[in-house]
């Protein structure tokens, strides 16, 4: 089956054609600041991004005869994981999303191309997948509720692949999935549902190459009201300029890990501290799963680092077997989900938020 995959990022658009799960063609480009400067809101980029995708297809002489089109899910209202058919409610919510990101355009572009192909259009496991158990939502401040934002697509895809590799279904296993990238999410996967996970985007859990993670609340409040920073600057500290970037002036984990492996400070101390916060979060998810954990999966780009994996395994491998599944194959994960929906192996969900 021919599956067309669309993945719009903040400064890039990636597309690929799969025959079943095999990639046969891929293209994309980085969009410069000049390219996007005329657009004041991400929604205004719709025609630009759609025309870019169609132009690449035309240049490669690829006809619009796909069996399915699937896009990276956008920042929708909280919804359970799975494969979703793109419907009018979804498109409305993406166009009116509270959070602005280019991934919100993926489903809109996929839907239009699918209409020309007379084929189904899907998204799968968007970042806002919310399967939290009730106790995981409450905080000590009634006005503040924990929310679920994490690397759902990759986390669930590697979970399914691991389950298949041992002859099981994802829904039969309890897993801790540690996604190690620019942001870090550590989730408790209980029989196919992520019942607890840190908010990997907005300042919770481990610190990461670009994000601050959990910060002592009193000191953060004092910083906010010190008069030194705007709200925008504080938010940038939490997401974008926090973590390794704040301490070391860089987010390049390859370079930092090399220096750390040679014992060079402050690189070793800061990187080891980050990994310590990751291990603590994995331990918390072990408690969430009541110690019944089939495996701990390490995934994402940082899982390619022997240094980081070695430090982490030394802190958590007594909890459960540690499985290494490095990298983040978003395009392959999306194709896998579309194929599963087409074959009826994965149930097709209806987007109908409460």
Residue ranges and their predicted role:
Residues 55-68, 165-169, 282-294:
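Phosphate/pyrophosphate-binding loops at sites that engage ATP/ADP/AMP, CoA/4′-phosphopantetheine
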Residues 236-290:
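Adenine-nucleotide phosphate-binding core of ATP-dependent small-molecule kinases
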Residues 306, 310-336:
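Conserved phosphate-binding/catalytic loops in two-lobed NTP-binding clefts
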Residues 3-44:
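Short glycine-rich, Thr/Ser-proximal phosphate-binding strand/loop in the N-terminal lobe
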Residues 326-354:
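Structural signal for terminal/edge beta-strands and the immediately following C-terminal loop/tail
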Residues 293-312:
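Glycine-rich phosphate-binding loops at beta-strand->alpha-helix junctions
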Residues 105-111, 123, 138, 143-174, ...:
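Glycine-rich phosphate-binding loop plus the immediately following alpha-helix
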Residues 57-103, 120, 128-140:
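Short beta-strand-loop/turn "lid" adjacent to the catalytic site in phosphate-handling enzymes
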């Amino acid at each position: 089956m021919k599956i067309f995959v669309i993945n719009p990022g903040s400064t890039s658009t990636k597309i690929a054609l799969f025959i079943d799960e095999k990639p046969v063609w891929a293209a994309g480009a980085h969009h410069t600041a000049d390219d996007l400067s005329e657009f004041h809101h991400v929604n205004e980029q719709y025609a630009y991004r759609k025309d870019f995708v169609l132009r690449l297809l035309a240049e490669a002489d690829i006809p619009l005869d796909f069996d399915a089109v699937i896009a990276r899910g956008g920042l929708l209202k909280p919804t359970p994981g799975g494969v979703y058919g793109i419907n009018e409610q979804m498109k409305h919510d993406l166009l009116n999303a509270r959070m602005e990101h280019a991934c919100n355009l993926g489903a809109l572009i996929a839907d239009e191309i699918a209409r020309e192909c007379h084929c189904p259009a899907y998204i799968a496991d968007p970042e806002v997948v919310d399967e939290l158990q009730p106790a995981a939502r409450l905080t000590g401040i009634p006005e503040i509720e924990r929310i679920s934002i994490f690397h759902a697509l990759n986390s669930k895809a590697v979970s399914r692949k691991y389950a298949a590799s041992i002859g099981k279904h994802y829904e039969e296993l309890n897993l801790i999935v540690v996604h190690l990238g620019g942001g870090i999410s550590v989730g408790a996967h209980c029989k196919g549902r992520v019942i607890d996970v840190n908010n990997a985007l907005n300042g919770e859990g481990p610190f990461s190459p670009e994000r601050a993670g959990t910060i002592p609340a009193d000191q953060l409040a004092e910083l906010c009201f010190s008069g030194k920073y705007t709200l925008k600057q504080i938010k940038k500290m939490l997401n974008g300029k926090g973590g390794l970037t704040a301490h070391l002036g860089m987010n390049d984990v390859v370079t930092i890990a090399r220096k750390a492996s040679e014992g060079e400070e402050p690189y070793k101390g800061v990187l080891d501290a980050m990994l310590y916060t990751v291990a603590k979060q994995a331990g918390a998810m072990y408690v969430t799963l009541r110690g019944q954990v089939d495996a701990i999966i390490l995934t994402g780009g940082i899982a390619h680092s022997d240094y980081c994996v070695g430090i982490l395994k030394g802190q958590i491998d007594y909890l459960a077997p540690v499985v290494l599944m490095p990298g983040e194959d978003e395009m392959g994960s999306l194709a896998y989900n579309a194929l599963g929906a087409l074959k009826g192996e994965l149930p097709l969900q209806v987007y109908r938020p409460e």
